[in-house]
Amino acid sequence: MDNLTNSIDQVVEENSLPHEWSKEVLAELKDLGVKNNKRDDLRKIPFVTIDGKDAKDFDDAVFCEANKDGFVLQVAIADVAEIVEPSSSIDKEALSRGTSIYFPKRVIPMLPEEISNNLCSLIPNEDRNVLVCKMNFTQEGEINSYDFSESIINSHKRFTYNEVEFLKQNKDTNLSADILNSINALEKLTKQLLNNRSKRYALEIESSEPTLSFGNEGNISEIFIPKRLFAHQMIEEAMISANICAAKFIKKHLGFGVYRIHEEPEHLKLENLKKFFSLKGLSTKSFSSPLEMINSFIKHVNKDEKNKITNVLILQSLKRACYSTKEIGHFGLQLKEYSHFTSPIRR
């Protein structure tokens, strides 16, 4: 047993993290399977997944096409509820865990691997039940209309972020024209969505979270901060768009819902942040709103790579995003309506 394994085991033990499955959960797993109920058949549409190279639970797939009016983006999300019955032992265990926990080289999943890495994972060339959010965008990247459907898809390819980034510079002739056209359309739509994000002054705080590499004995061999790629933003903006539509949908059809909210920062924390940047020589006198002030600080920090550690201080001044039945909007994203419809395998 190496040093890394020992360290993770210690963290699991000290925090009493549930990491084994009960007999009841294991018994239910034997009877699970993909149901063949009536669904929209979208298997011919070239959906693809785009994830990190080490990902095993593929819970979202995308397809995008451009037309004379703008863009049509379809986001397919694994339909976990089709497999996990309400109040079942698996459901109760997922509720207890709340989220998957990711350690280096180890994951403690919220759902058993048979579900998260197989039955609900959008593996290439496998039929999977999904919920699809189909969105029509204008040329400027504004959502014109949307609808949700219970569908079945068959992922045509599993991409990594680096592979999609490579495609932006080098067109892979081994890929079908449909897949290439979809990636190109999503790239163009993402540029519009990022432009809209900038116009509404959503916060753009780049993560300085390091990634660790480990040697054979479990010792740290390298520490580095991974580069954020445009391919990451393609998926992020696609998921944000789907989550906006999810919030609108539940509000329209149910009159209430569970929203992902982010409140404005507290006055005292903003004052402390102002003092810090004032000592750094930055003028802090002429801001009309907390949003303008924080964006100014972020812009200042991002001018120099050496300053980016200061992003941690900005993050600490913000409130934590949370779930609520009160729809008060998302300060960081500058959205009035926002929920979490995506990533049902891990949260």
Indicate where each model-derived feature is located.
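Electropositive polyanion-binding surfaces
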Residues: 1-347
